[in-house]
Structures are given as structure tokens and as C-alpha cells.
């Protein structure tokens, strides 16, 4: 089973693109897409539920369920037509981002049983129905491979057009760990990532870093490898003022952004100190 993890907040204008991208995946295996709304203050929760109620078998008691918890409301069901597609909707009651609270404990019922984890935030989306199948085929074929990523289109929120592409290489192949480290967290687009859920020995300094994707990319590159597919399967939205990267590149110096910068530096310092062989070889 594959678990797709989608965190979203105040993305009512964009979330339907993400949901459609999840639902259209054609796979030979079941996929549970976990959509976590972090107590949005716009109309996003209702947009998500309307889509869910329209496209999923919410009255099929053999699969579907709803649950009220102290932290949020949960909705789970199978897609009416795509029988390998399941949605788990979690509408949080309180905003966890502002409180620096982890959402991971709430995802264990779906994530723990998954062999692979796919990532896509609420303002990004997938464009190819074979995206997941092709990613998983690589992971199944290459036992040492820890992560797969791909070329990604860049959609300008200001201009409403595709303005370019984000790519790591000009052909399929393994990424050099040096490039993964030196080129930073944007070298690999989050919405293109699928990784093995069985990551053993994930270091503490990576778990406490507030830029979660970047240390995972580094760890996977150094422990098995990251394989790159030179084909566009997804869209990364740029110039979105409500996203973290939009705030980051617009010069927003909020406490959270400063904390992310600080913990990223701490993570890299810890990596260099614990990997002297890599440093001596000039790899980082």
C-alpha cells in the first residue's frame, strides 16, 4: 500500500487540483491519500468535504467511516470508480503549525501500514495518472533505492501560466548526494517525491529540523540513493503568498521562518560533524 500525505492550510482556491491528481492515479495497488487541513480559516474544509461526498462511497459501511476526536474530524471512504483510491480526510480543530505541534501521530493508522510514502502539499498537484505507478515501479525494481523524484512544472500564481520546469538532470538516473546536499531543499520538488517508509536510523538532528523534506532527501541520498525520472508528473506552484516558500522568498522574516533557517543550519552542521569521511572526500 502507498500512503500519500497532503498537508494544507487556506488553499481553498487550489486544493481541488491536488484532490483530482490523487483520485486519477491508475495503480495496481491501493493508495490512501491522507489530506490534513490545519484548521483553515477560508472555505477549504468545505471544499474538501464537498469533493469527498460527491466522488467517494461515503455510505458504504463496509469501508467508509466518520470519527470525531479531541483533535479533529476524520472522514474515510473508497472512491466510487477508482477502487484502488481511498481518501482519509482529517480536519483539525486547532492550527498545529502556529503551535509548532506535530501532526504525525494522527497519521499512524494509515501511514504505518504503508510500504511507500508520497508527498504533495495542498497548493501543488499531480498531472499524470501514472505518476505513482511509475515511481513505485522504480522502487520495486531497485531495492537499494530509498527515494524517487522527477522533473516538475512551475506554475506562476501571479501570471497563471507554466513559466518553467524544475529538474535535477537531463536524463533518468541516480542523483549525486553532493548535489542533494549542496543545492538545498528546492533541488528536489516535494510534490514529486515518493520514498520508502522503512527508513531505519533516521537521525535525531533530522527529525527536529523544521525543513522536513530537505534532511529526508539528504538521508535517502546517503543511504541507498535517490533516483530521478526526467519526466514531468506534477506541478509546483510558485509566487503563492500563503505558502511557506512564498513567504520565504518574499523576504518574510517571521519567527517560524527564522526557526527553519536556524534548524536547517544545525542539521547541516550535525551532518558534517557526523560524516567526516564525506567531508574529507569533498562530497559535502
Each language-model region and where it sits:
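Cell-envelope/extracellular polymer assembly enzymes that use nucleotide-activated donors
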Residues: 1-3, 32, 215
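Short, well-formed alpha-helical segments that are part of the catalytic scaffolds
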Residues: 11-24, 46
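Acidic donor-binding segment of Leloir-type glycosyltransferases
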Residues: 23-90
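Active-site nucleotide-sugar/metal-binding loop of Leloir-type enzymes
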Residues: 104-116
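Conserved donor NDP-sugar-binding/catalytic core segment of glycosyltransferases
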Residues: 125, 129-163
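Conserved nucleotide-sugar donor-binding catalytic segment
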Residues: 150, 167-252
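Catalytic core of nucleotide-sugar-dependent glycosyltransferases
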Residues: 232, 236-240, 246-278
Amino acid at each position: 500500500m502507498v500512503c500519500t500525505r497532503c498537508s494544507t492550510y487556506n488553499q481553498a482556491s487550489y486544493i481541488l487540483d491536488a484532490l483530482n491528481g490523487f483520485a486519477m492515479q491508475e495503480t495496481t495497488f491501493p493508495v490512501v491519500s491522507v489530506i490534513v487541513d490545519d484548521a483553515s480559516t477560508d472555505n477549504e474544509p468545505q471544499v474538501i468535504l464537498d469533493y469527498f461526498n460527491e466522488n467517494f462511497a461515503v455510505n458504504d459501511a463496509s469501508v467508509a467511516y466518520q470519527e470525531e476526536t479531541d483533535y479533529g474530524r476524520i472522514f474515510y471512504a473508497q472512491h466510487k470508480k477508482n477502487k484502488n483510491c481511498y481518501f482519509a480526510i482529517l480536519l483539525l480543530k486547532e492550527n498545529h503549525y502556529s503551535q509548532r505541534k506535530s501532526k504525525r501521530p494522527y497519521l499512524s493508522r494509515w501511514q504505518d501500514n504503508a510500504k511507500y510514502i508520497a508527498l504533495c502539499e495542498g497548493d501543488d498537484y499531480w498531472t499524470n495518472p501514472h505518476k505513482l505507478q511509475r515511481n513505485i515501479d522504480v522502487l520495486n525494481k531497485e531495492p537499494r533505492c530509498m527515494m524517487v523524484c522527477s522533473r516538475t512544472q512551475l506554475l506562476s500564481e501571479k501570471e497563471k501560466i507554466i513559466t518553467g520546469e524544475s529538474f535535477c538532470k537531463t536524463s533518468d538516473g541516480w542523483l549525486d548526494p553532493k548535489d542533494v546536499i549542496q543545492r538545498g531543499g528546492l533541488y528536489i520538488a516535494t510534490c514529486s517525491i515518493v520514498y520508502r517508509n522503512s527508513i531505519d536510523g533516521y537521525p535525531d538532528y533530522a527529525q527536529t529540523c523544521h525543513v522536513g523534506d530537505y534532511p529526508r532527501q539528504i538521508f535517502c541520498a546517503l543511504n541507498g540513493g535517490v533516483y530521478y525520472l526526467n519526466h514531468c508528473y506534477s506541478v509546483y506552484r510558485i509566487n503563492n503568498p500563503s505558502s511557506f516558500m512564498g513567504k520565504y522568498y518574499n523576504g518574510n522574516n517571521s519567527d517560524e521562518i527564522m526557526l527553519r533557517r536556524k534548524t536547517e543550519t544545525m542539521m547541516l552542521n550535525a551532518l558534517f560533524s557526523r560524516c567526516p569521511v564525506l567531508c574529507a572526500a569533498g562530497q559535502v
